[in-house]
C-alpha cells in the first residue's frame, strides 16, 4: 500500500532520473514480489484522509506525482507482479505501457469504499481500455486477471513470473539503444495526438522536436551506421 511519504519519494526519484542523461528508460515496479501497488494505505486514512482539508492535500499531492509520470519526457514501463489495485491501477495507467506476470490481478475498488475517483484517473482508464470496459471495471469494482487485462488492452505483455524482469529489461534495452531525441519526440507527439484538441503551443513544440531530430548528430550517426551496416551509437545530441 502507498502512503503520502512514498508518493514524495517517487517524485524525488523521478526528478533525479529526468536530469540524468544516462537514464533513457524508467521502470516502475513494486517491492516484495506480491504487488505493484495494492492501493492506498487504508491504515493511514484517518491521518492522511480523515478530513476535507486532509483529503484535498492528499489528492493534490498525488495528482502532481501522477502528472509527472504521465508527462515524463523519457519512456516509462510499469513492471507489474501481483496486485495492481486502486491507486496502483491509476499509477500504472500513467506509464507508457505495462508488462505483467501471469499472476497479476487488477481492480478499481473505489465503489466498495465510497471513494470519489477523479476526472484525470477516469480519463486515463478510458484511454487505456475504452469507456464501456472502464465503466464495467469501475461500477462493479471486480478484479480481473492478467489475460483479461491483456485482452482489454490495459497491459501489453503477459509472461511467467520468473521471466518478468528479463522481459522488461529486454524491452527497456531495445528502447535505450534507439535515438533518445526521436523517442522523446514520439512520446511527446503521441501524447498531443491523444488530446481532443491539441493547443497551438503543443503543436509548435511537436514541429520543433521533429526538426531537432533531423538537425542532430544522432541523425548523422544513424545514416552512417546504416551505410556501414553496424549498430548506431546514439548520444542524444
What is each PLM-predicted segment?
Residues 1-29, 67:
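Conserved CoA-thioester-binding segment of acyl-CoA-metabolizing enzymes
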Residues 9-10, 28, 41, 75, ...:
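Terminal peptide-recognition signature
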Residues 13, 57, 61-72:
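Catalytic-core regions built around general acid/base machinery
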Residues 20-21, 33, 141-147, 162, ...:
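C-terminal alpha-helix plus adjacent terminal tail
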Residues 33-37, 84-86, 107, 190:
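Short, active-site-adjacent cap segments at secondary-structure transitions
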Residues 47-60:
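A short acidic, glycine-rich active-site loop
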Residues 68-181, 216, 221, 230:
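Crotonase-fold acyl-CoA enzyme core
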Amino acid at each position: 500500500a502507498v502512503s503520502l511519504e512514498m508518493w514524495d519519494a517517487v517524485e524525488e526519484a523521478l526528478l533525479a532520473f529526468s536530469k540524468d542523461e544516462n537514464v533513457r528508460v524508467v521502470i516502475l515496479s513494486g517491492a516484495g514480489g506480491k504487488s505493484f501497488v495494492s492501493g492506498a494505505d487504508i491504515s493511514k486514512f484517518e491521518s492522511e484522509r480523515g478530513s476535507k482539508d486532509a483529503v484535498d492535500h492528499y489528492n493534490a499531492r498525488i495528482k502532481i506525482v501522477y502528472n509527472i509520470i504521465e508527462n515524463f519526457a523519457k519512456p516509462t514501463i510499469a513492471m507489474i507482479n501481483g496486485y495492481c489495485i486502486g491507486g496502483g491501477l491509476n499509477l500504472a495507467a500513467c506509464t507508457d505501457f505495462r508488462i505483467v506476470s501471469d499472476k497479476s490481478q487488477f481492480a478499481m475498488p473505489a465503489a466498495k469504499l465510497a471513494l470519489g475517483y477523479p476526472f484525470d484517473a477516469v480519463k486515463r482508464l478510458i484511454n487505456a481500455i475504452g469507456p464501456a470496459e472502464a465503466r464495467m471495471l469501475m461500477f462493479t469494482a471486480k478484479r480481473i486477471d492478467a489475460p483479461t487485462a491483456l485482452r482489454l488492452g490495459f497491459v501489453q505483455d503477459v509472461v511467467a513470473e520468473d521471466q518478468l524482469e528479463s522481459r522488461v529489461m529486454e524491452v527497456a534495452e531495445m528502447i535505450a539503444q534507439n535515438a533518445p531525441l526521436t523517442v522523446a519526440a514520439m512520446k511527446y507527439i503521441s501524447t498531443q495526438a491523444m488530446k481532443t484538441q491539441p493547443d497551438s503551443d503543443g503543436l509548435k513544440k511537436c514541429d520543433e522536436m521533429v526538426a531537432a531530430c533531423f538537425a542532430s548528430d544522432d541523425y548523422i550517426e544513424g545514416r552512417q551506421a546504416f551505410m556501414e551496416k553496424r549498430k548506431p551509437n546514439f548520444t542524444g545530441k
